[in-house]
From Swiss-Prot:
Protein name (record): 3-carboxy-cis,cis-muconate cycloisomerase
Single Gene Ontology BP annotation: 3,4-dihydroxybenzoate catabolic process
Record keywords, A-Z: Aromatic hydrocarbons catabolism, Isomerase
Matches recorded under Gene3D superfamilies: Fumarase/aspartase (C-terminal domain), Fumarase/aspartase (Central domain)
Job of this protein: Catalyzes an anti cycloisomerization.
Similarity field: Belongs to the class-II fumarase/aspartase family.
Record-listed E.C. numbers: 5.5.1.2
Domain of life: Bacteria
Catalysis: reaction(s): 2-(carboxymethyl)-5-oxo-2,5-dihydro-2-furoate = 3-carboxy-cis,cis-muconate + H(+)
Entries under PANTHER family matching the protein: ADENYLOSUCCINATE LYASE, ADENYLOSUCCINATE LYASE C-TERMINAL DOMAIN-CONTAINING PROTEIN
Organism per entry: Bradyrhizobium diazoefficiens (strain JCM 10833 / BCRC 13528 / IAM 13628 / NBRC 14792 / USDA 110)
Amino acid sequence: MSTALSPLLAPMLSSAAMRAACDDRSTLQNMLDFEAALARAEAATGVIPAAAVGPIETACKAATFDIAALAEAATRSGNLAIPLVKALTANVAKADAEAARYVHWGATSQDVIDTATMLTLRAAIDALDADLSRAIKGFAALARNHRNTAMVARTWLQHALPMPFGLKAAEYAASLARARCRLRRLSRDGLALQFGGAAGTLAALGDKGLVVAERLAQELNLPLPEAPWHTHRDRIAEAASALAILAGSCGKIARDVSLMMQTDVAEAFEPAGEGRGGSSTMPHKRNPVAAASALGCATMAPQLAATIFAAQVQDHERSAGPWHAEWPTLPQLMLVTSGALAAIVDIAEGLDVDAARMRSNLDATHGLIMAEAVTFALAERIGKSDAHHLIEAASKRAVAEKKHLREVLAADSQVTAHLSPEKIAALFEPMAYQGASQAMIDRLLDSLERD
């Protein structure tokens, strides 16, 4: 697996841990780990001599292989496993010609490559899990600290109702916790050994095929599937889906943060730092750089996942083409997902919330944001339809006369006949109209540790 990202761009669009998991040397080592484990499994089950294991294991070191030469040879063989096995066999033969006879015994190229992909995915999930836990913890802290910080809830980008910022932060944490849940389930149940031999029947191993497969799965600590899955790619598609969903969740958070950072909104800001968020020409700017990185990654992820989904349509017992499409695509999806998440970790752990500005923005529409609260209070006396028409007319007058809605209502005899001045004033306190928000915050926070 190549990182498929330019070295100039990779640090901005991926995490260091994911780059390490997906780089060529790690991929090669995962393939060699399969070969070493296969030798151990076959020796343990009496398929190959025990004496062959040591020389094979010793030769399974990625650092001793020429990656460029393997890549060039793969263009002629159709996949990387063929030249790798050839080179590995030659290296083993230098130390023990007899042991070299048993390299890759009974396996096929796809067994090597797919199992290496499973090992890469496992490392990738571990890396994502660590960052997810950090982001969840950060947003949970914001939710607790700002559960009584009133802000504008926006629908269709317009002021709608008041809400506590803590609810928004708790929703962020919960969406990431659900993503973590998916990935943990995938790591536990969705990854699996690939081992079927030339056509998925393990025919070369005679009656020892399933016994070797079971031991090989144990050696690699991977679940043993009921049968090989060479051209049934739902496992890969499920991984792509979980990754793309996580990237999308990160993108949603990043979109909100970038909008809250707008000069005219100014409710929250990414953490400040030397040289961070500046413009090449405008020294006053504080750009949403982490949000932009997350959004860029989240924009790429769906198309990458779509390629993986398209590659599910494979022919018979070995695919000519669609399988190849997975090789550069899946690692790039892992990388950009990690990049989106890394940016969100940065935001979660350092978001600067301006509670005073949030309150100021609530007041910017001169009470119109509380129109629903007044409508429902009045509806208890005169019915919802009449209350709606009355408050709608009052809201239009408030806008036309440039007055606070509270002032207009206090002067309206149709309203004061049913609501006292004190009641009207109380209805314009944003945190008095938050519905089940506090209970929702608690429920969301309680859900964070579920697997």
